[in-house]
Amino acid sequence: MRMLDDMIENPPAGMSEEEKKVYLEDWRSAKEWGGFLYSIERWERIAEVEKIVCNACKEICLGLREEELLGLLAEGGMKKTLKEEFSEDKAKDARYLEYIVVDDVLLLDAHREYGGEVTKELVRQMLLGKEGKDIDKRYVDRVAGVVRERQRKREEETERSVKELVGDEEKAKSKEEKAKSKEEKAKSKRGRKGKSASAPSEQEEEKKESEVEEAEQGGEVEALPVEVGGARSKGGKKKSKGGRKCFKIHRRVLRWTKSPEKIKEEWDKGSEERWKGRSLEEIKEQKIVHDITGVLELLRSEDADRFFMDAGKYRKGGSERQRMVAIGALETGGQRMTGVVEVGTFKDGDGCPVVYHLRFKPTSIGSIGDVINPGVVEASDVGRVDEGEECEDADKFVYPKGVRFETVKETGSFQIVWKNPSDTSEVLRRLIVYCRPCVI
C-alpha cells in the first residue's frame, strides 16, 4: 500500500495533464481495491459468514430424512443453471457446478438479529434455488416472519399434545376412582343385613354408572372410507370435481395393471423393442414399479403442484412431451426404496394430457441430478408413442377385479396402499409421495 501511495504522489515526469489524470485515476482505483482485498476486518467477516453457512448446511442435511434430502436437491437442481462465464467442462474441473453471490454483511446482520434458525432457513432457500440478487433486507424479514409462525405453531402443537396427555391421565384416574368407589359400594351392600325392597338392585346401579361413563366419553365416531376412483380413500371429506385436472391414461400405462402373464403377452406382440422378449420374472419386477396408476388420483387433484415439480418439455417421436417428477418411497417385500415418481404426458387432439409413462424409479442422492436433467430424461424416453391408441379417462379408471388398494391423503404425503384381497390387514405394497419443500 505504501508503494501505491508513492506512485500516486510521484507520477512520472513529462506527462501531459490528460495522461496524468488517467494515470492517477488508475492507481487510486488500484489502491481502493487493494485496501478492499487486504482488509483484515473484511476477511474476518467473510470467514465468520462461511462458518455460519457451513454449519447451517450441515444441520440442514443431517437433520433430513433421505427422501427430504432428495426433495431438497431435486427442487434446487430444477431451478439452478451453470453461470454463463463457466462452460460445463470447466465447471466440472473446478468442482464448482453452482454458486450464488449474496451480501455477506446482510447475511451476518440477519444471523445476529434473528439467530440461527432464520439463517438456516435462508441457506435452505439458497439450496432450493433462491437467487442471491433476490435476497435483500425485506426478504430476510419475510423469512424471519415465516420461521416465527412455524415456531408458534410448533409450540401450540406441543401445548395441545401436553393438554391431551394430561386429559388422558385425568380420565384414567377418574375411571380408576369410579371403579374403586363402585367396589367399595358393593362391599358395603354385601355387609348390610336388611335391604329395602324399594332400593335399586346392584345390577341396575352398575348399568346406570356405565351409561354415565359412556356419555362422558362422548364416543368419537370413526369416519368410514369412501370409494374414490376405484380405490378406497381415507383422510377427509369427498371433494367436488371443481378444480380437478383432466387426464387420460395411455394403453401402455394401463397394461401394467394386468397379470404378469398378460403383460408379457401384450409386450411381446407390441411394437416397443425394449419390452419384447423380457422374462416373466423381469415383468414381475417391473410391474412393482410401473403398476402405480393410483398416483393419478393425486395428479388430478387441486394441489397436485404441491407434490409434483415440472421437469421440462421437449419434442420426441413427433410429439411434444412434458415430464413431471415427485419424491417418493416404495415399500414392498420388507424393503423400502426412496426415489422419484415419474410422469410423462403428451396432449391429444382435444388438448387433454395423456399419461403415457408412469413409474417409480429408485434413486440415490448421488444420481438425483441425472433423474431431473432434461437431456438425460429425453435420451432415455421411449422413442415413439402410438398416439392413436385408445386411452381411458383417469376419472373412470378402476383396477381389475380382485385388486384391493386404497389412497390415503395426509398433510405432507399421499399414500397408495395395496392389500391382500383375502386378508386386508396384510399390506402387500405401499407407495408414499411426499410434498415438495416449502419455497419462500
Swiss-Prot record:
Query: Where is composition skewed (Basic and acidic residues) in this entry?
Result: 150-186
User: What intrachain disulfides are recorded?
Assistant: none
- Which chain regions cross the lipid bilayer? none
Biased composition annotated in UniProt, kind: Basic residues: 234-244
Question: What protein does this entry describe?
Answer: UPF0329 protein ECU06_1680
**Per the similarity annotation, which family is this?**
Belongs to the UPF0329 family.
Where are the stretches annotated Disordered?
A: 150-244
Supply the Pfam families for this chain. Answer: DUF1609, DUF3654
Highest taxon of source:
Eukaryota
